[in-house]
C-alpha cells in the first residue's frame, strides 16, 4: 500500500513561510544597531563564505520574543490541522539553530528542528541534501516560499 503524500513528514521553512519576516534581517537590526563594532566581523564572514558563522554569532547575542514575530496565520492554522491529525512536522530553516529552536518551542508543533549551525548554512541544495539524507528522495513534503527552495522542492514528494 502506497503512502499518501499527506502522511509523509512535512519540512517547513521558517523565513517568509512560517513567519512573514526574515530572522537574519531581524538579527542584524536588533544586534548590529546596538553593537555596531560587530559589523566588520559580519561583513568579513559574509565575504569569505562564512554566512553560517555570522548567523551563529548574532544568534548567540540576539534577544527576542518569538510571540512578537509576525506569523503566516492561515498557514499556521493549516499546519495545526496537519499536526493534530498526527503528521510529523519539522522546522527546516537556514536560520541559526539557536534562533530556530526558540521559534519551534513557541509554535509547539515541530517534532524536530533542522537549522544552520556555526559551520553549515542549511539553505538551497544543502537543505535538500539534509532532508534527502534523513527521509530519502521523495520521502517528505516541503513548504517554502522562495527561489532558494527550488532545490528542496525538486526532491520532495509534496510541494507547498
Can you describe what each PLM-predicted range is?
Residues 1-7, 64-160:
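C-terminal cap/substrate-recognition subdomain and adjoining C-terminal extension
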Residues 2-59:
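Active-site neighborhood of HAD-like aspartate-dependent phosphohydrolases
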Amino acid at each position: 500500500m502506497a503512502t499518501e503524500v499527506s502522511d509523509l513528514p512535512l519540512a517547513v521553512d521558517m523565513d517568509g513561510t512560517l513567519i512573514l519576516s526574515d530572522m537574519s534581517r531581524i538579527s542584524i537590526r536588533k544586534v548590529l544597531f546596538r553593537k555596531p563594532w560587530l559589523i566588520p566581523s559580519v561583513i568579513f564572514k559574509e565575504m569569505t563564505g562564512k554566512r553560517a558563522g555570522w548567523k551563529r554569532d548574532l544568534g548567540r547575542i540576539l534577544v527576542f520574543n518569538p510571540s512578537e514575530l509576525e506569523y503566516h496565520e492561515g498557514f499556521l492554522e493549516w499546519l495545526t490541522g496537519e499536526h493534530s491529525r498526527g503528521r510529523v512536522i519539522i522546522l527546516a530553516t537556514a536560520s541559526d539553530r539557536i534562533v530556530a529552536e526558540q521559534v519551534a518551542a513557541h509554535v509547539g508543533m515541530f517534532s524536530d528542528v533542522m537549522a544552520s549551525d556555526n559551520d553549515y548554512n542549511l539553505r538551497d541544495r544543502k537543505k535538500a541534501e539534509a532532508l534527502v539524507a534523513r527521509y530519502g528522495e521523495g520521502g517528505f513534503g516541503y513548504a517554502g516560499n522562495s527561489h532558494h527552495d527550488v532545490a528542496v522542492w525538486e526532491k520532495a514528494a509534496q510541494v507547498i
